[in-house]
Amino acid sequence: MRVLMVAQSPIAGDSRILREVAALTGAGHVVHVVGRDVPEGFTLEGGATVESVSRSAGLRGGSGPAVGHGQRGAKVLVQRFGRWLLLPEHRLRTEKQWRTAAAATLSGLEPFEVVHAHDFNTLELAAAFASRWSATLVYDSHELWFDRALPGRPTPLWRVRGRRSELALARQAAVVFTVSDGIARRLRERGLPDVRVIRNTFPRPEVAPSLPSAPTGLLYAGRVGAGRDLPAVVEAARLLAPFPTLLMGSVDPNYRLDLGSVQKVPETSIDEVDRVLQESGISLVTLTNTCENHRLALPNKLFHAVRAGVPVVAADLPELRAVITRYHLGTLYTPGDGASLAAAVRSLIADYAGYVDGVRAAGDELNWEHDAEVLVSAYSALAKPPANAH
């Protein structure tokens, strides 16, 4: 089938979309992606094509260091209050501007048989073009969209109306995908009967992971920004010193944090992250307990650690707890509590070999080859004519 994927995320860095594209082209589908800020010369696997629609970068702060000592003073407080007040409208405006530009791009394309919407901020656009082309709509909910912790002033009415809109639009989809059992249950409770889970797992490694007999450090590899519980990481690093704590990842604009004894290391390729994870021996999967989306999340870094064969210390949130305890992947800490995080690290070190064995065994199930089959099977069913067709 001819498949159009639509996403407002930067495609080059969205591993879920890249893996889904590869799985579908590998199954014989023709895939075109319209995404955000695609780098010049960027290509996709399997002959899939991609084109870019740019989006406003958002409200910008000062030009000071992104990770370091926070700025203070009356002027800074006024600026922060202004951002807090205006950010919700600005976020909606930039997303709408992207959809308007993307609609013009889509209008110039030949019709597709399937329109695959990645996240709610593309769902209305995707549904409109699926209807125009008499195509099948697929909704891929990477997050529990209206239950996220967002910067800026509270917007309770937007959340209530948004959930209603999401339900009305998603009911037009032939199938809905999401990233965890917890989010799937919540979407079903809200009225979507067919929700299937495709976790953000990684392909199995070609070579079995090699780890030290005892861990030599902690690694946080992921986005550096609000909601990642990094102040707790900094406090735990102080309590665990001189045991090294490393931080690797892109830094959100305007995010300020005094890293203390945490060592910032350069970003690198996914394969190189595997190596650093394996050399350190422990992966940090940290989140704040500030929203339902976090409580039901299964972050990429959990499955990256499984691919690398590395045990985790993770936030004690319902969905993370369920997976980590089921597979014996590591230990849990109370979000926001650096002392709890440090204690969880010590507990993991005390039974390190046992957790390594658990991660190794979990790799047989927690891998992209397993999850890709859910996607490919669903598309195979979409390609079949209805039983009553003549």
Language model features by range: what are they?
Residues 1-55, 175, 199, 232-240, ...:
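N-terminal subdomain of nucleotide-sugar transferases
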Residues 20, 88-107, 124, 128-132, ...:
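Membrane-proximal helix-turn-helix segments that form the acceptor-binding/catalytic region
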Residues 177, 210-228, 234-238, 375:
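Conserved donor-binding/catalytic core segment of Leloir-type glycosyltransferases
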Residues 182, 201:
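Carbohydrate-associated surface elements
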Residues 243, 249-277, 282:
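Nucleotide-activated donor-binding/catalytic signature segment of Leloir-type glycosyltransferases, i.e.
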Residues 283-286, 304-314:
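Short hydrophobic beta-strand element within catalytic cores of glycosyltransferases
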